[in-house]
From Swiss-Prot:
Originating gene: ICAM4
Membrane-protein topology: Single-pass type I membrane protein
Organism lineage string: Eukaryota, Metazoa, Chordata, Craniata, Vertebrata
Main location: membrane
Localization: Cell membrane
Family: Belongs to the immunoglobulin superfamily. ICAM family.
One GO biological process term: cell-cell adhesion
Signal peptide stretch: 1-22
Post-translational note: N- and O-glycosylated.
Assigned keywords, A-Z: Blood group antigen, Cell adhesion, Cell membrane, Disulfide bond, Glycoprotein, Immunoglobulin domain, Membrane, Repeat, Secreted, Signal, Transmembrane, Transmembrane helix
Pfam families to which the protein is assigned, alphabetical: ICAM_N (PF03921)
Name this polypeptide is given: Intercellular adhesion molecule 4
Spans within the Cytoplasmic topological domain: 262-271
C-alpha cells in the first residue's frame, strides 16, 4: 500500500503536466544511447574540404595532364571528375584520387572534382590551358620609304593567338605594341606585324627588336628576334641624295677656284 501512493502521484503529475512525461521519455531514450552520448540526427552534415592540385596547368597541344583531388572526408560516399577532356587512368588512395587527362588540345578547359560526404557534395576546380610557344620571331631589315622606316615582324607557329602580344622596341623604349585578343582561332598560326617608324637623327645606330609574349592566366611565355640596327646605308635614296650634294659642292668649289685663278692671272699680267 505504501508503494501505491508514489505511483498514483506519478500518474497524476503526468496527466496534469504533459511536459513532465515527455521529458522523462527523452531522458530514458538518452540513457539508452551508446556510450551515453545523444544520437546525431540523420540529416547532419560532416564539415570537410576538397582541393585540386595543380589549380592551373599549361601544356603543349596533344600532351597529357595528371590532376590530384584530395579531401578531408573520413568516409566519402562518392568521388568523380567532370571535364570535357578525355580521361585516362584513375588512381585512388585514402583521401585522394588521381585523374589522368589525355591529348589536351583545347586552349582552355576546366576539370571539376566532386566529393560527396554524409549526403553533402563539395567540389574544387582546375584550369588546363594548351599552348604552343612561338617557333621563331623574325624581324626583316627595315626599309626606308620617304622619311619612315617600314618594320615587319613575323611570329611563326604560335597558339593560342588570342593571348599573343607583339612589341617593337627601339633601343630602350617601346615604339609599338599590339594585343591580338580579337583572334579566336583554335589552330597554330603565323602572325605578321607591320609598322611604320619615323626615325630621327638620334634613332640611327640603335637596335630594333621584336618581342612576342603569350599571357596564359599566370604563365608567361616569351620569344624575341635578333636585333637589327637602323642605318642610313639601307636606303638608296639617302645615298643618292648624299652623292648629289657632294657633286654640287665640288662643282661650286671648282667654279670658285677657277674664278680665283683667273683673277690672279689677270692681276699678274697687269703687273
Amino acid at each position: 500500500m505504501g508503494s501505491l501512493f508514489p505511483l498514483s502521484l506519478l500518474f497524476f503529475l503526468a496527466a496534469a503536466y504533459p511536459g513532465v512525461g515527455s521529458a522523462l521519455g527523452r531522458r530514458t531514450k538518452r540513457a539508452q544511447s551508446p556510450k551515453g552520448s545523444p544520437l546525431a540526427p540523420s540529416g547532419t552534415s560532416v564539415p570537410f574540404w576538397v582541393r585540386m592540385s595543380p589549380e592551373f596547368v599549361a601544356v603543349q597541344p596533344g600532351k597529357s595532364v595528371q590532376l590530384n583531388c584530395s579531401n578531408s572526408c573520413p568516409q566519402p560516399q562518392n568521388s568523380s571528375l567532370r571535364t570535357p577532356l578525355r580521361q585516362g587512368k584513375t588512381l585512388r588512395g585514402p583521401g585522394w584520387v588521381s585523374y589522368q587527362l589525355l591529348d589536351v588540345r583545347a586552349w582552355s578547359s576546366l576539370a571539376h572534382c566532386l566529393v560527396t560526404c554524409a549526403g553533402k557534395t563539395r567540389w574544387a576546380t582546375s584550369r588546363i590551358t594548351a599552348y604552343k610557344p612561338p617557333h621563331s620571331v623574325i624581324l626583316e631589315p627595315p626599309v626606308l620609304k620617304g622619311r619612315k622606316y617600314t618594320l615587319r615582324c613575323h611570329v611563326t607557329q604560335v597558339f593560342p593567338v588570342g593571348y599573343l602580344v607583339v612589341t617593337l622596341r627601339h633601343g630602350s623604349r617601346v615604339i609599338y605594341s599590339e594585343s591580338l585578343e580579337r583572334f579566336t582561332g583554335l589552330d597554330l598560326a603565323n602572325v605578321t606585324l607591320t609598322y611604320e617608324f619615323a626615325a630621327g637623327p638620334r634613332d640611327f645606330w640603335q637596335p630594333v627588336i621584336c618581342h612576342a609574349r603569350l599571357n596564359l592566366d599566370g604563365l608567361v611565355v616569351r620569344n624575341s628576334s635578333a636585333p637589327i640596327t637602323l642605318m642610313l646605308a639601307w636606303s638608296p635614296a639617302p645615298t643618292a641624295l648624299a652623292s648629289g650634294s657632294i657633286a654640287a659642292l665640288v662643282g661650286i668649289l671648282l667654279t670658285v677656284g677657277a674664278a680665283y685663278l683667273c683673277k690672279c692671272l689677270a692681276m699678274k699680267s697687269q703687273a
